[in-house]
């Protein structure tokens, strides 16, 4: 305080002020400090000092033609003296004001497009809600997070090619745009940025923000998706947090979230099929997430999650070298071990064959809600330092570490038999048996473990067998810490192999991942996941099976139509109709099938009775083994929404509704697609137009082979005959004309002849 008072007194004397303001600085050290090097040492001061001058700015000489010498108030805007050392003009800051007010204006249309990520960020903040501030200890752990909301997931190289193609299309250099996303983005951006006057370099920077994922290794407590990370500085400090709900979502977070859900669903479904690996690959290749192919997303998206990594491994992609156990990611930070098979007896005298890891090792364990450091020797836990959000999370981590340690007292704590099975009803391996057992009830494990007195160490406390904190005693080797353990920061990826049962191993044969590690958590995906594989239709329940079955028929209508008329049995046996059978009441399946097949046969026999909508509607019912009966049905029942709903054979119903005006089909109120051909148009327009250049000779003639679809006609040689399936399911015999005739007469004759051939 004394010194401050003294200073105040000194400053009140005018002499002190004079010395400080008037004295020249001539101390060599100071001069050196401020003049050596090109780097500005005091930018703020320099700016103030420069702006205090009359003409601190230089401009191109052309400015003299574009700006008056004086503004409305008569103040001088530019000086006639040249800037020393360049041929530029000295300009006053007032010139900038004049330019901003009166200078030429350009179109602003491109700004929101180029600076899209900024405009969107402002929108999210504007519509976001900030809640109360809470003061409490923050357990932050460093995680690799996405800091750039709203980006696509291109690799740096792919993005570079897109940017060059969009911003500098005439530059030399090979650019290969191969992936679908590259082509789509390039096309979109070229259209958006036509006649864009913004500096190309700026456009390139902004495009990079939009195309490439940027990650940083940051301390985070709470949400890790990019819309939370962009406000990290507003939502968490060292001892406080502010509640926040983002005012919008961004596609990249949605992709990450939906990818995890799709991968989990696919792994779970693959596990129960006859060949898990083949099924998994089939599903990954036929699934789309938000309109993008899942395999393309897997190749580009760095998300590390157990199910996602299993899918990546199946595709031959590299994954992180850490391994997963009990939902925690383990990364060995030091030590090494060798594996040996050993037999042990549980407390229930059941024999377990366990692969024991012999040797001293240290691991970090990172989970969603708890993290830990584990030091262990052969079948012995030396030390476990845990931190977590709450008692429950800490307990989860302790159980996993105790099982992982393979200690004898853990194995002896087992009561009852271990017979846990996976989804495919196969027994789990011994380590997962133990894990499941103690996850259900760990009381005996904690009680048998033993406690020890503890020293007072800053930031650490003990935890008792009933999971309450203590400063005197703790579970043997276990401590709870206030600070979290950082996630493994390296982005290194390794080559792995995967076996038929989806167990992923590194090159030394260590199991990194297996389906047992895939979380059972169910979530709702943010983006639409379209599982084209019929194996996945059951995933979202009966409604999804219904919608997907009809969507599949409509998507493949061209081929379905031909099979329907030529080879119905093959069509009825398609695997795509299997899930549908579970919706049809057991007792009625055979009868419905017999009825529908008979109806279809009648349509084939009587020309002109073909009815697209009816075939699509009834086809799935024909897949069950038919019962021959004379029964007729006016409606068929399907079990959806917890009860039987009716599909009307000759009309619309809430389950199956075809709108003639829009030509669209809705199934249970969901759009199932459009019929490309009009089922009600008789046979006139479409066919006559398509059959240009063909003569219709009459009804189908089997000698000329199976019916072709209209698209296949183009392969016929002149004068060649063929049966062709026209829109209404009728088959007629045609011949390719020998000469190119007038289109008009062709269409008219075609129409007449189709009518004659059919009637």
Curated annotation (Swiss-Prot):
The keyword Hydrolase does not apply. This is Polymerase basic protein 2. It is found in: Virion; Host nucleus. SUPFAM superfamilies: PB2 C-terminal domain-like. GO terms for molecular function: RNA binding; RNA-directed RNA polymerase activity. A motif (Nuclear localization signal) lies at residues 736-739. Plays an essential role in transcription initiation and cap-stealing mechanism, in which cellular capped pre-mRNAs are used to generate primers for viral transcription. Recognizes and binds the 7-methylguanosine-containing cap of the target pre-RNA which is subsequently cleaved after 10-13 nucleotides by the viral protein PA. Plays a role in the initiation of the viral genome replication and modulates the activity of the ribonucleoprotein (RNP) complex.
């Amino acid at each position: 305080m004394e010194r401050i008072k003294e200073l105040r007194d000194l400053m009140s004397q005018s002499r002190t002020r004079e010395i400080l303001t008037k004295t020249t600085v001539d101390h060599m050290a100071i001069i050196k400090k401020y003049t050596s090097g090109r780097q500005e040492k005091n930018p703020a001061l320099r700016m103030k000092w420069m702006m205090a001058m009359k003409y601190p700015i230089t401009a191109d000489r052309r400015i003299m033609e574009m700006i008056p010498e004086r503004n409305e108030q008569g103040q001088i805007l530019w000086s006639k003296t040249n800037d020393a050392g360049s041929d530029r003009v000295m300009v006053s800051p007032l010139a900038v004001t004049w330019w901003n007010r009166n200078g030429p204006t350009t179109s602003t249309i491109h700004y929101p497009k180029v600076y899209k990520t900024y405009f969107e960020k402002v929108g999210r903040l504007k519509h976001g809600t900030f809640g109360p501030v809470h003061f409490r200890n923050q357990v932050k752990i460093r995680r690799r997070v996405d800091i750039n909301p709203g980006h696509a997931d291109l690799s740096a190289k792919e993005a570079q090619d897109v940017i060059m193609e969009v911003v500098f299309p005439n530059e030399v250099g090979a650019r290969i745009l191969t992936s679908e996303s590259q082509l789509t983005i390039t096309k979109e951006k070229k259209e958006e940025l036509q006649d864009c006057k913004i500096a190309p370099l700026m456009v390139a920077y902004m495009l990079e923000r939009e195309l490439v994922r940027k990650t940083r290794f940051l301390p985070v407590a709470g949400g890790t998706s990019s819309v939370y990370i962009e406000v990290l500085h507003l939502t968490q400090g060292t001892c406080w947090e502010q509640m926040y709900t983002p005012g919008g979502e961004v596609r990249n977070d949605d992709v990450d979230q939906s990818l995890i859900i799709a991968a989990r669903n696919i792994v779970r479904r693959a596990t129960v099929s006859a060949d898990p690996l083949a099924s998994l690959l089939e599903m990954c290749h036929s699934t789309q997430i938000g309109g993008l192919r899942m395999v393309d997303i897997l190749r580009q998206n760095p998300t590390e999650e157990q199910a996602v990594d299993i899918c990546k491994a199946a595709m031959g992609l590299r994954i992180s070298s850490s391994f997963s156990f009990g939902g925690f990611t383990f990364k060995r930070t030091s030590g090494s071990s060798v594996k040996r098979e050993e037999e042990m007896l549980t407390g229930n005298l059941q024999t377990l064959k366990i692969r024991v890891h012999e040797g001293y090792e240290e691991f970090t364990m990172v989970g969603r809600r708890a993290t830990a450091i584990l030091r262990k020797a052969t079948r012995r836990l030396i030390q476990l330092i845990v931190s977590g959000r709450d008692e429950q999370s800490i307990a989860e981590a302790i159980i996993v570490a105790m099982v992982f340690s393979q200690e004898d007292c853990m194995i002896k704590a087992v009561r009852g038999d271990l017979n846990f099975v996976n989804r495919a009803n196969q027994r789990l391996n011994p380590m997962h048996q133990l894990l499941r057992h103690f996850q259900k009830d760990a009381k005996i494990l904690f009680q048998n473990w033993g406690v020890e007195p503890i020293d007072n160490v800053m930031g650490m406390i003990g935890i008792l067998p009933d999971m309450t904190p203590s400063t005197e005693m703790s579970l043997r080797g276990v401590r709870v810490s206030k600070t979290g353990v950082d996630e493994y920061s390296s982005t290194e990826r390794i080559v792995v192999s995967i076996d038929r049962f989806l167990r992923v191993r590194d090159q030394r044969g260590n199991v990194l991942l297996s389906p047992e590690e895939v979380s059972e958590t169910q979530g709702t995906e943010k983006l639409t996941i379209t599982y084209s594989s019929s194996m996945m239709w059951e995933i979202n329940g009966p409604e999804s099976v219904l919608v997907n079955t009809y969507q599949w028929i409509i998507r493949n209508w061209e081929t379905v139509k031909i099979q329907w008329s030529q080879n119905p049995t093959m069509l009825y046996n398609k695997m795509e109709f299997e899930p549908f059978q579970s919706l049809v009441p057991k007792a009625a399946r055979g009868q419905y099938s017999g009825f529908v097949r008979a109806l279809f046969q009648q349509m084939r026999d009587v020309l002109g009775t073909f009815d697209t909508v009816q075939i699509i509607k009834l086809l799935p019912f024909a897949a069950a083994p038919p019962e021959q009966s004379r029964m007729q049905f006016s409606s068929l029942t399907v079990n959806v929404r917890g009860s039987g709903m009716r599909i009307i054979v000759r009309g619309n119903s809430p389950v199956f509704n075809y709108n003639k005006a829009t030509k669209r089909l809705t199934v249970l109120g969901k759009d199932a697609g459009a019929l490309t051909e009009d089922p009600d148009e008789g046979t006139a327009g479409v066919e006559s137009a398509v059959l240009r250049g063909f003569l219709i000779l009459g009804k189908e003639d089997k000698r000329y082979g199976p019916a072709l679809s209209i698209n296949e006609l183009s392969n016929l040689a002149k004068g060649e005959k063929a049966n062709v399936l026209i829109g209404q399911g009728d088959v007629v015999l045609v011949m390719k004309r020998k000469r190119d005739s007038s289109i008009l007469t062709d269409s008219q004759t075609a129409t007449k002849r189709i009518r004659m051939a059919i009637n």
